Amino acid sequence: PPHAAPAAGQIARRSELVLIPVRPSAFDLAAVPAAVEIVTAAKVRGAFVLSACPFRAPEIGETRAALEAYGLPIVPGEITDRRAFARAVTTGSAVTEFEAEGKAAEEIRALWAWIKNTLERK
């Protein structure tokens, strides 16, 4: 929301890395410039995470191509819109606990590995 920008900027300035989740949708892409502006103004590293992606949808590639214009890294892969995420929440668990060997947990572990590697490269 527009009124959240001041708080988001304060939080970003105190961060080492800001992840910008982007769903493959026109609404999310319309919000990207404001998010990039917050990251740039905070002088902090930022990266896009494709999230809530429909399985194998062509929009994923189109969204990735649109994000490349902003010059921030795009986390490899994506977080797919899987039932395991919703089911895990109803049990009060993270998807890595709920279905540890499932595809959703694999995607989250891959995201965490990328974050960890990025932070270690300061």
Regions picked out by a protein language model, each given a short descriptive name:
Residues 1-11, 22-23:
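Switch II (G3) loop of P-loop NTPases
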Residues 13-17, 89-92:
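Short, basic/glycine-rich phosphate-binding loops at helix/coil junctions
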Residues 54, 64-93:
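Beta-strand-loop-alpha "switch" segments that mediate conformational coupling across diverse proteins
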Residues 89-110:
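C-terminal boundary of histidine-terminating zinc-finger modules
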Residues 14-54, 58-68, 79:
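Anionic-ligand binding region
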Residues 112-122:
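Short, hydrophobic alpha-helical segments
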